[in-house]
Amino acid sequence: MRHVRSPLALVIIFLVSAFQPLALAQTIDGFSAIKAQDERRLEEQFRAVPQSASAREHLRRLTAEPHIAGTPEDYATAVYVRDQMRSFGLSAELKEYQVWLNYPKTDPVVELIAPRREKLSVREAGLREDPTSSNAKITPLFNGYAASGDVTAPLVYANYGLPPDYDALAKAGVDVKGKIVIVRYGNSFRGVKAKVAQDHGAVGCIIYSDPADDGYAQGDVYPKGPWRPVASGQRGSVQYLFQYPGDPLTPGKPAIPGTPRISLEEAYADIPRIPVQPLAYDEARKLIEPLKGPARPRGFQGAFPFPYHVGGTNDVRVHLKTDMDYASRTLWDVVARIDGREESDRWVILGNHRDAWVFGAVDRSEEHTS
C-alpha cells in the first residue's frame, strides 16, 4: 500500500530542521539557551577590552632584561605588574617569600677528556639577527636545584633517561653506576631524568635537546622558524616536583619568615645530590658521536647523522663540574583580589610565574601580558 506524506508533516519537519542549527548554535555546555546568550554577551564585552598595542607594550616592559627569580630585574617586573594592577583599580600588593635557590658561582665545566681533550661551551652563541641573544646578563646554561659536584667518568647515552631506557641499557649489558649519563629532553619532566639517573647510580647527568625532538628535524630553526637552533640549550629546574613543589626547605607551607625549615639532608628527598647540566645540541653531538659500546637499542636513535651508540666504555670520558651558590633569596608575588557578587565563600585562584630563565617572552610573560 502506498503511503503519502501530508504537506503539513513536511512543513513541520522542515521547520524543525531549519531551526535546529540555530538552537544548537545558541547553546554552550553547562548553560541553558537563555544563559548561553548572556554568557556570549559577557564574552564579547571581555574580548573588546584587550588592545594589541597595550599588550605589546606590557610584553616589552616585562621582557626588557633577563630576570631570573630573586634578582633585581625580577623585582622590577614585580613592581611593574603591581603598579599596572593598581592602575586598573585593584588593590594589588607585593608578598615576599624567602626561598632556597641556586645560581652558578662560575660557569659550569663540561669537558671531553677522551678520545681527545676539548672544553665544551656552556653558553649559547648569540645570533646576528637577534641582538638580545648577546645580552651580558644572560647566565650560562644551568639547572635550578642541581647539586655542586666535580666528577670525571665514562659517558653513557641513556636516551630520554627514563626507567625503560635504563632497562634497555641493562639488557645491552651497560651499567651506568659510577658513570655520567647524557640524556635528551622530552617524554618527561627534566627532574624525573635527574632522579632516575641518580637512582641508577650515575654520578652526573647532562641533558640536551636532540634535534629530533626540538631542532632542525622538526622544521626551520630560529630565527627562520620556531624550532631550537643548534647553539641553544634548555635551562630549567630539576627539583623533584612530583615529590612536592615550592621551596625545598618548607614543604607544603609558605616560605615566609617564621615558617620552620627542614634540614638540607631532608630536602634531598626533593632535589638531586648529583651535578646536572644542560647543553646545547651542537656541543652534545661532540659527546655522543665518538661513543662506542653496544649499538642503540630500539628508539634510542636521534636526528644526528650517525648511528647512536650507548657507550659505557673508557673510550669516551667526560669531566663535569658545577659550583652552585645556594642561599635563601627573596622572591615577590604580586597579589590582587576581586570580590565577586555571589558565592563569597568560594575562591577562584589565577596564577602565573613572572620570573624567567632569560627574557621570558614565551615562558611566561605572554600570559601576564594577556
Language-model regions, residue ranges each:
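Boundary at the C-terminal end of the N-terminal hydrophobic targeting segment
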Residues: 23-27
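Noncatalytic luminal/extracellular "stalk/propeptide" segments of secretory-pathway proteins
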Residues: 28-37, 48, 60-175, 180, ...
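Acidic/histidine-rich, surface-exposed loop or edge segments in extracytoplasmic proteins
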Residues: 37-43, 55-67, 266-269
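Extracytoplasmic/secreted proteins, especially bacterial periplasmic and envelope-associated proteins
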Residues: 41, 54-57, 61, 76-87, ...
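Sec/Tat-exported extracytoplasmic proteins
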Residues: 50, 54, 59, 63-73, ...
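Conserved small/polar residues in nucleotide/adenosyl-binding loops
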Residues: 366-369
